[in-house]
């Protein structure tokens, strides 16, 4: 799946953008995903990982 964190499963969220007149327009908030090289099952792979997962140490870059 594209644009989904392989560690935490974080992905884009949807909601409404509200104008001053409170008109609603659909929009998306993307997760802060970084494409990094990590070792998974002994192989080096390039995967999308959220910045929060990187900062918390759930995954380590290669």
UniProtKB/Swiss-Prot annotation:
Signal peptide: none annotated. GO terms for cellular component: ribonucleoprotein complex; ribosome. Residues 1-28 are annotated as: Disordered. InterPro entries: Bacterial_rp_bL28, Ribosomal_bL28, Ribosomal_bL28/bL31-like_sf, Ribosomal_bL28_bact-type, Ribosomal_bL28_sf. One of its GO terms (biological process) is translation. The keyword Chloroplast does not apply. Keywords: Ribonucleoprotein, Ribosomal protein. It comes from the Bacteria. It holds the Pfam family Ribosomal_L28. GO terms for molecular function: structural constituent of ribosome. HAMAP family: Ribosomal_bL28 (MF_00373). Belongs to the bacterial ribosomal protein bL28 family. PANTHER family: 50S RIBOSOMAL PROTEIN L28, LARGE RIBOSOMAL SUBUNIT PROTEIN BL28A. This is Large ribosomal subunit protein bL28. It comes from Bacillus anthracis.
């Amino acid at each position: 799946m594209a644009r989904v964190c392989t560690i935490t499963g974080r992905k884009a969220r949807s909601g409404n953008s509200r104008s001053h007149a409170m008109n609603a327009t659909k929009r998306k908030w993307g997760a802060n995903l970084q494409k990094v090289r990590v070792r998974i099952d002994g192989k080096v792979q390039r995967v999308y990982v959220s910045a929060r997962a990187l900062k918390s140490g759930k995954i380590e870059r290669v």
